[in-house]
Amino acid sequence: MRTAIERRELLKAVYEEARGCVACPLHETRTNVVFGAGNADADLMFVGEAPGANEDQQGLPFVGQAGKLLEKLLGEIGMERGDVFIANTLKCRPPGNRDPYPHELDACRHYLESQLELIAPTMICTLGNFATKLLRGDPIGISKIHGQPEVRTIGPRTVRLYPLYHPAAALYTPSTLEMLRGDFLRIPEILALGPPDQPEPPAAPPEPAPAEPVLGAEPTVAAPPYDAIPEPPEPPDAEQLGLF
């Protein structure tokens, strides 16, 4: 099992990879990669849709009006931003805040899955349709399943998945805000259940049986230890890689 320091260093490496990503055309119009922010050891993680204009300028998720509402809702359950980790399905802003395209979600999925594996939250709150459909692997919309916690295996980990309306959808619709607030109030009781059982790790392949000696065969002469196989070079350290 990785230590907290090891997980943070790996998370920084994924961040550096994302900063240089050119896997889809969104890199041509972004100002900043919006990787995610918060507590890298959080039990609770929020996953939204994509950065907006404010997020693209600042490089941080949920810093506009939807972010202020998210902070207010967290405060109502005795939490703050520093207690959780917040990310999006996309790390770059789609032009005009349009909906993400499927190929963009596919190109960015690696970064989100790496975050989920390294942060290892107990509970993930998906915010809105795109995050919910992506992590559930199901086309059912948020209006039908919001506020219904379930246990899901995502990548190598099993988590408590809790679909919620996106705060942006609740800004100007009182009925949606009421539903979002009611669902939010259940977060502490779901977190209190603790982490779900994790899947068994895959069994190691069996060791191959030693080869039987062939009668009458000439004995094999071992190759010189240094001539044929050179020593591998030393890996670069974090400073050389530009990690912080």
Over which residues does each language-model region extend?
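A polyanion-binding, active-site-adjacent surface
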Residues: 1-244
